[in-house]
């Protein structure tokens, strides 16, 4: 029920690309251009400056985008409120998740959530923690899932699940048979790290600093944009790297990588749900938030002696939100 021309403008403004916008809107590119032109005529203001293949928002366009996003959110909230009167959870839900969460946690949460609420349409984007926080603040998503806290006053962080970062080496690496190394040895070996802005990198740097090791003293051989890339690099013998315990279950079982304990270094963090500071969200976003907090309680993990995550067998069957909340109350 969102005003159609305003929706076309909003999608173009967010993509800054008419071709991408046309694909998202399932319209031809000329139809997108025509709708934008008609809106500009109606308002008497130019909304975009077009220079060759580049599109930028004018001051009027930037101003309108703020209100277009607000209008879209308000209309979606209205539809969700009406659905709630019928006892349904329905509507669109836009999420952003950091890469580790998107790969290893979000799929299991979404799979169960959609079984219970099949009328919800979910769209999700992924990036590093910094990008997820930006998407939330800019209003492009309703909720975010990240590694660690957001560290912003305008963002509320809620813990979902504990994670541990472990150092891994290839099975034929000299450290594989030792199993344990000292911090001084870590400084001598090529290290594969996530890119700046990543929650994984930040938590590793903070832990190393607390242990008296500065990042500048390490031999950072490569900076990579995903956990999978680090695992693959380690398997190929390019160095060692810190990754989430969730990322290496298969590789440890296959024997391609080995977790290495570092004396005096224990890197623990939280996977967290983030939302704008203020009242708890309602509608579809509120339903997902409550479900996610309850779901991760019901499927919490423990680790074996290798630091590999193992699911608690007492919670293999997914619980409904009401059942999980009842269980939480009993355990208090």
Identify what each model region corresponds to:
Residues 40-57, 62:
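A short LG(V/I)-centered, amphipathic sequence patch enriched
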Residues 128-133, 137-141, 146-147, 205-258, ...:
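Hydrophobic hinge/microswitch elements
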Residues 105, 258-302:
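A late-sequence structural motif
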Residues 154-192, 196:
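Flexible hinge/capping segments at coil-to-helix
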Residues 175, 191-212, 281-283, 298-305, ...:
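Secondary-structure junction motif
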Residues 90-153, 224:
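Central regulatory/effector-binding core of bacterial HTH transcription factors
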Residues 11-28:
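Short helix-boundary/capping micro-motifs
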Residues 153-159, 163, 185, 228-277:
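Beta-alpha-beta core module
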């Amino acid at each position: 029920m969102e005003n159609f021309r305003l929706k076309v403008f909003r999608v173009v403004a967010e993509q800054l690309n008419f071709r991408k916008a046309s694909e998202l809107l399932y319209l031809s590119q000329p139809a997108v251009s025509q709708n934008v032109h008609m809106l500009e005529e109606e308002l008497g203001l130019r909304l975009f400056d077009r220079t060759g293949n580049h599109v930028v928002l004018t001051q009027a366009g930037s101003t309108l985008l703020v209100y277009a996003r607000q209008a879209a959110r308000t209309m979606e909230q209205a539809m969700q409120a009406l659905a709630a009167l019928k006892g349904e959870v329905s509507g669109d839900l836009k999420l952003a998740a950091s890469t580790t969460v998107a790969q290893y946690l979000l799929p299991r949460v979404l799979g169960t959530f959609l079984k219970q609420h099949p009328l919800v349409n979910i769209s999700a984007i992924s990036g590093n923690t910094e990008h997820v926080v930006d998407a939330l603040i800019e209003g492009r998503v309703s909720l975010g899932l990240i590694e660690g806290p957001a560290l912003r006053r305008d963002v509320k962080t809620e813990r979902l699940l504990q994670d541990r970062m472990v150092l891994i080496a290839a099975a034929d690496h000299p450290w594989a048979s030792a199993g344990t190394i000292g911090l001084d040895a870590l400084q001598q070996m090529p290290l594969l790290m996530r890119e700046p802005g990543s929650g994984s990198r930040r938590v590793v740097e903070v832990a190393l600093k607390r242990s008296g090791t500065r990042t500048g003293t390490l031999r950072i051989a490569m900076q990579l944009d995903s956990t999978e890339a680090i695992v693959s690099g380690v398997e190929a013998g390019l160095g060692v790297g810190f990754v989430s315990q969730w990322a290496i279950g298969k590789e440890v079982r296959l024997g391609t990588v080995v977790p290495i304990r570092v004396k005096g270094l224990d890197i623990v963090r939280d996977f967290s749900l983030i939302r704008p500071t203020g009242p708890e969200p309602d509608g579809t976003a509120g339903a997902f938030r409550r479900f996610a907090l309850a779901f991760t309680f019901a499927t919490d993990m423990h680790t074996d002696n290798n630091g590999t995550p193992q699911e608690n067998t007492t919670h293999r069957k997914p619980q409904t939100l009401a059942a999980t909340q009842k269980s939480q109350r009993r355990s208090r």
